[in-house]
């Protein structure tokens, strides 16, 4: 989860988030090199006393500064497209969970079980226990098995919402009348926090998401206790 004064991304807990962090570093390095080159050229232009008044065109230079940016854009686009298609792939999910956005809470339905659904509301500040996080804790966490592909079906009952868990690389819009899907996979057990990431009304900031990833055996015991 995020912590105060954090500058970087949250620790990756899914293969998709690991790919996104690698792509971020890859792109940032290209931007840094281009910015350094531009600043260097600007400093040369400001400090040099040499001028050339007879040059009207330079075909070689124009060719270079046309081809080189195209190559750089390709180097950025190829890994970006690869990750984009990876995020859309859902191969043999072991579980499907439907989440619906409401003003201002989330509801979850485990479609592989006959009667396993619940609403998830934020716990008010005056009801928090010691050690719990303000505006991030909920009364009912969504529990899922770790290290397994899980399909999330995401929609909304009223206005636009967005279901987002940054450390898992997830952010999917919840749109009324439309069913979006995403893949959830976690490399390790833990509790992961997110929030609605689309302004949806006066209590938009009171729509936290808490996702608890546990081993498969514990998940089976949890599901049996609720059905």
Swiss-Prot record:
Catalysis performed (reactions): 4 Fe(II)-[cytochrome c] + O2 + 8 H(+)(in) = 4 Fe(III)-[cytochrome c] + 2 H2O + 4 H(+)(out)
Biological-process GO terms, alphabetical: ATP synthesis coupled electron transport
Cofactor note (record): Binds a dinuclear copper A center per subunit.
Protein residues bound to Cu cation A2: 196, 198, 200, 204
InterPro entries referenced in this protein's UniProt entry, alphabetically: CcO_II, CcO_II-like_C, CcO_II_C, Copper_CuA, Cupredoxin, Cyt_c_oxidase_su2, Cyt_c_oxidase_su2_TM_dom, Cyt_c_oxidase_su2_TM_sf
Gene Ontology terms for molecular function: copper ion binding; cytochrome-c oxidase activity
Family: Belongs to the cytochrome c oxidase subunit 2 family.
Functional note: Component of the cytochrome c oxidase, the last enzyme in the mitochondrial electron transport chain which drives oxidative phosphorylation. The respiratory chain contains 3 multisubunit complexes succinate dehydrogenase (complex II, CII), ubiquinol-cytochrome c oxidoreductase (cytochrome b-c1 complex, complex III, CIII) and cytochrome c oxidase (complex IV, CIV), that cooperate to transfer electrons derived from NADH and succinate to molecular oxygen, creating an electrochemical gradient over the inner membrane that drives transmembrane transport and the ATP synthase.
E.C. numbers: 7.1.1.9
Requisite cofactors: Cu cation
Ranges in the topological domain labelled Mitochondrial intermembrane: 1-14, 88-227
Protein name: Cytochrome c oxidase subunit 2
Known partners and oligomeric status: Component of the cytochrome c oxidase (complex IV, CIV), a multisubunit enzyme composed of 14 subunits. The complex is composed of a catalytic core of 3 subunits MT-CO1, MT-CO2 and MT-CO3, encoded in the mitochondrial DNA, and 11 supernumerary subunits COX4I, COX5A, COX5B, COX6A, COX6B, COX6C, COX7A, COX7B, COX7C, COX8 and NDUFA4, which are encoded in the nuclear genome.
Pfam families tied to this protein: COX2, COX2_TM
Gene that produces this protein: MT-CO2
Cellular localisation: Mitochondrion inner membrane
One GO cellular component term noted in the UniProt record for this chain: mitochondrial inner membrane
Organism from which the protein derives: Taterillus emini
Keyword terms: Copper, Electron transport, Magnesium, Membrane, Metal-binding, Mitochondrion, Mitochondrion inner membrane, Respiratory chain, Translocase, Transmembrane, Transmembrane helix, Transport
Transmembrane segments: 15-45, 60-87
Keyword Iron: no
PROSITE patterns documented for this protein: COX2, COX2_CUA, COX2_TM
Mitochondrial matrix side: 46-59
Magnesium listed as a keyword: yes
PANTHER family: CYTOCHROME C OXIDASE SUBUNIT 2, CYTOCHROME C OXIDASE, SUBUNIT II
Residues that, per the record, bind Mg(2+): 198
Entry binding sites for Cu cation A1: 161, 196, 200, 207
Topology of this chain in the membrane: Multi-pass membrane protein
């Amino acid at each position: 989860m995020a912590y105060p004064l954090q500058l970087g991304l949250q620790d990756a807990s899914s293969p998709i988030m690991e790919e996104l962090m690698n792509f971020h570093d890859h792109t940032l390095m290209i931007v840094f090199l281009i910015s350094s080159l531009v600043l260097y050229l600007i400093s040369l232009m400001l400090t040099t006393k040499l001028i050339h008044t007879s040059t009207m065109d330079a075909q070689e230079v124009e060719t270079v500064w046309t081809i080189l940016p195209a190559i750089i854009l390709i180097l950025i686009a190829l890994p970006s497209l690869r990750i984009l298609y990876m995020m859309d792939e859902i191969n043999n999910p072991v579980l499907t969970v439907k989440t619906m956005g409401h003003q201002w809470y989330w509801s979850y339905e485990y479609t592989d079980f006959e009667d396993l659904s619940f609403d998830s509301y934020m716990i008010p500040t005056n009801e928090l226990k010691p050690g719990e996080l303000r505006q991030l804790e909920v009364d009912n966490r969504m529990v899922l098995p770790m290290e397994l592909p899980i399909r999330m079906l995401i929609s909304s009952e009223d206005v636009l919402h967005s279901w987002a868990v940054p450390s898992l690389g997830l952010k999917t819009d919840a749109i009324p009348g439309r069913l979006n899907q995403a893949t959830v996979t976690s490399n390790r057990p833990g509790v992961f926090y997110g929030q609605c990431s689309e302004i949806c009304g006066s209590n938009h900031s009171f729509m936290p998401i808490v996702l608890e990833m546990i081993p498969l055996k514990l998940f089976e015991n949890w599901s049996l206790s609720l059905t």
